Regions:
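Hydrophobic, well-ordered secondary-structure elements that form the walls
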Residues: 34, 95, 123, 182, ...
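Conserved FAD/dinucleotide-binding core of flavoprotein oxidoreductases
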Residues: 2-6, 35, 87-122
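A glycine-rich dinucleotide-binding beta-alpha-beta segment and adjacent secondary-structure elements
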Residues: 74, 129-191
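Mid-domain catalytic core of redox enzymes
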Residues: 1-86
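Flavin-binding catalytic cores
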Residues: 39, 66-68, 108-148
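A conserved FAD-binding loop/helix module that cradles the flavin
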Residues: 187-209
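Short glycine/proline-enriched loop/turn "hinge" motifs that connect secondary-structure elements
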Residues: 83-90, 173-178
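Active-site-proximal substrate-binding core of FAD-dependent oxidoreductases
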Residues: 211-216
């Protein structure tokens, strides 16, 4: 809803608490998809590499919104469960790093390649030895992708933050109060984020539409 109000409607929501610039939006993500000619059998389906200064890192991402050079990482290796890549003697992954959203004004066009190398260095040191020599192909997406292609506000990865004053009733309503025929679903909409929350928003919005249009 934040992006829709700002970019499509070009107006502010009636509820001042739902003004996009007032709301706290979630972090964004830097995601690298890559394949290797080496099979890393010791890596499970899900791996998390925590930064040693975890609390300070969160402050840099959420509060200071500054560029980081020591991210925590989530590594996803589907081959650990699927196994089909082994017949081709290759492996595939994606790795994501939480980063500030685009309200930080970080120029990802300039910094993207450097940050990719930082991530690969961490992976090589802590999880995937010999990674750089084993790389077959890779590409990455930045907060710009979330903002420009997925139309998320400031490139946020998960909508508005699920803090108390932005939870449940305080999130965007399922029906826009300014219009009789505008409805919302999604992570930033009541009742909340996450897959169960998003499904719940769809069910709640469906009930509103059926009621408004007299459909039983």
């Amino acid at each position: 809803p934040s992006m829709f109000y700002e970019k499509v409607l070009h107006k502010k929501p009636l509820k001042i608490s739902n003004k996009p610039s007032v709301l706290k939006h979630s972090m964004s993500l830097f995601v690298i998809y890559f394949s290797t000619k080496k099979i890393y059998d010791h890596i499970q389906h899900h791996t998390i590499i925590f930064n040693k200064r975890h609390k300070e890192l969160l402050k840099d991402i959420f509060d200071k919104k500054v560029m980081i050079d020591d991210p925590s990482l989530y590594l996803h290796r589907p081959m650990a469960t699927d196994g089909k890549g082994q017949q081709f003697e290759s492996d595939s992954f994606y790795v994501l790093a939480p980063v500030p959203n685009n309200s930080s004004n970080i120029n990802w066009n300039d910094y993207g390649d450097k940050f990719k190398n930082i991530v690969f260095d961490i992976l090589e040191d802590y999880a995937l030895p010999g990674l750089k020599k084993s790389l077959v192909d890779s590409f990455y997406i930045t907060p710009n992708y979330f903002e420009d292609e997925l139309n998320t506000y400031a490139g946020s990865g998960f909508g508005i933050q699920p803090i108390f004053r932005q939870s449940a009733y305080f999130r965007y309503s399922n029906k826009a109060p300014e219009f009789n025929n505008l409805y919302f679903v999604g992570a930033s909409t009541h009742p909340g984020a996450g897959v169960p929350g998003v499904i719940s928003t769809a069910k709640a919005t469906e009930k509103l539409i059926l009621k408004d249009y007299g459909i039983s």
